[in-house]
């Protein structure tokens, strides 16, 4: 109501300018001053008094506010008179402002009683306490981890109780795994101790085994000399048969200190260590004598001889050490129809004879039993078996070493009951050639790559020691009684062998 006082325009009497007398029945004219443009922006709403009715009783004033007028439409400069209808027996015109002020004054508010006010304050305080308690309960419920769907300060919903349950489950599983691992570790440790104890007992009961290796010189048997004496101490090598031999096909050092040489044109010759010819045979019934072998004081030689049909065929001929004929046995007859490039004869400790044949397009291995029965062990096309050696006999198994000249490897063949039961390929040197074995079981190989004869470590199957330097290609040689019999073009070189390291 206080703001409305500023909008009231007071009535002022001007007797000098007005000729119309005023009376209680005469309508009074209220002049409203023209508004200023600045007042329109300061006061957006203008209020006007329409009609004041005066009666005999207290004056009755009716004030109505017009609808809001936009500030952009100013009023006209003219003054619009407004007529007020008066009621008879009204108060004089000069008392109207006082009545208006009395009507517009705020009604007095009765002061509350002290007891009622105290009760109201207590009620308000209790209501505030209840509201605070409810707010605290809601906040604690939101932050309590045990409450499902609890929220944090950022209102991100998650179930922390479910996380705790998963975490506890994972911990229990990890503990179970650790316990299981601990049990298995203890079990493995116990088993290891038990196995170690058994191995120790077996090792104590088993006989002690010594391995013979080339590196351990104390285990290598000493090189034996010929019973009749070998080369002089100051002589390393000698040449025999020079000018006599033409096409050497095999050499052999006999225990008697003599050297046997087979020649395809000359026949069989027997030399001493000084190079003198002791015996010589070239029978007309035999030709193409190859690969002599010494076995139980007899000499076995491959040669062509006439069979029952008076045809030339391959035979194994037996001679004495004095070159006397003993017997013969025919080789597989179909070999006479093939072109043979190379042959090699070898005999094992169980008296089984083995024949290796290398043809133009094939290679074969054959076995002759003591009862005179031939068996074909292997037949290979596109293979070149250039040499063969009966290496060892272990019980019923005989091991053969076969050299493959095209692919440069050595084949270890195991034979049992006239049948190959196992084979193994080995690379004992760069390019293996002829093989030889002395009376002590040492194995020698001709290395065509280094043009040398090397000692082979039969534990690792690699060449370890250089024994002699030779020509690039050696078809065959013999090692026996500390001497190497190496065939040359038209002579035989006897050389004392010793072990020199390759490094």
From Swiss-Prot:
- Composition-biased stretches (Low complexity): 16-26
Q: Where is this region: Disordered?
A: 1-26, 132-156
Q: Which domain of life is it from?
A: Eukaryota
Locate the compositionally biased regions of type Polar residues: 147-156
Put simply, this protein is called Uncharacterized protein F44B9.2
- The organism is Caenorhabditis elegans
């Amino acid at each position: 109501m206080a703001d409305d006082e500023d909008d009231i325009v007071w009535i002022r009497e001007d007797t000098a300018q007005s000729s119309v007398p005023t009376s209680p029945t005469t309508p009074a004219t209220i002049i409203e001053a023209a508004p200023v443009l600045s007042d329109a922006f300061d006061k957006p709403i203008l209020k006007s008094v329409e009609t004041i009715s005066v009666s005999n009783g207290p004056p009755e004033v009716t004030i109505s506010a017009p609808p809001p007028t936009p500030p952009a439409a100013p009023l006209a400069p003219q003054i619009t008179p407004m007529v007020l209808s008066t009621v008879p027996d009204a108060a004089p015109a000069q008392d109207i402002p006082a009545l208006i002020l009395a009507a517009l004054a705020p009604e007095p508010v009765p002061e509350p009683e002290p007891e009622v006010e105290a009760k109201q304050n207590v009620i308000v305080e209790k209501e505030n306490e209840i509201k605070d308690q409810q707010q605290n309960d809601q906040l604690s419920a939101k932050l309590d981890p045990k409450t499902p769907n609890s929220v944090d300060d950022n209102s991100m919903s998650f179930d922390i109780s479910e996380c705790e349950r998963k975490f506890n489950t994972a911990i229990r599983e990890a503990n179970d795994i650790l316990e299981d691992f601990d049990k298995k570790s203890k079990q493995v440790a116990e088993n290891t101790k038990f196995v170690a104890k058994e191995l120790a007992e077996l090792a104590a009961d088993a006989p002690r085994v010594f391995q013979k290796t080339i590196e351990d010189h104390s285990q290598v048997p000493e090189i034996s000399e010929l019973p009749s004496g070998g080369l002089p101490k100051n002589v390393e090598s000698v040449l025999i048969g020079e000018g006599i031999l033409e096409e050497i096909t095999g050499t052999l050092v006999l225990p008697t200190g003599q050297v046997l040489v087979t020649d395809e044109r000359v026949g069989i010759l027997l030399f001493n260590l000084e190079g003198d010819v002791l015996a010589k045979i070239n029978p007309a019934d035999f030709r193409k004598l190859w690969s002599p072998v010494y076995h139980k004081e007899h000499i076995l030689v491959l040669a062509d001889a006439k069979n029952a049909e008076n045809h030339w065929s391959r035979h194994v001929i037996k001679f004495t050490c004095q070159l006397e004929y003993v017997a013969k046995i025919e080789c597989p007859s179909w070999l006479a129809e093939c072109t043979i490039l190379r042959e090699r004869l070898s005999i094992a400790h169980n008296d089984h004879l083995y024949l290796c044949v290398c043809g133009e397009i094939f290679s074969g291995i054959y076995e002759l039993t003591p009862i005179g029965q031939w068996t074909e062990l292997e037949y290979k096309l596109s293979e070149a078996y250039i040499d063969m050696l009966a290496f060892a006999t272990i019980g019923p198994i005989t091991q053969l070493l076969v050299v493959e000249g095209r692919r440069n490897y050595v084949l270890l063949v195991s034979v049992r009951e006239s049948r190959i039961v196992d084979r193994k390929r080995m690379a004992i040197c760069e390019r293996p050639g002829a093989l030889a074995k002395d009376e002590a079981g040492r194995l020698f190989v001709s290395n065509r790559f280094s043009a040398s004869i090397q000692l082979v470590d039969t534990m690792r199957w690699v060449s370890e020691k250089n024994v002699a330097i030779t020509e690039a290609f050696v078809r065959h040689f013999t090692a026996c009684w500390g001497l190497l019999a190496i065939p040359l073009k038209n002579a035989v070189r006897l050389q004392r062998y010793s072990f020199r390291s390759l490094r």
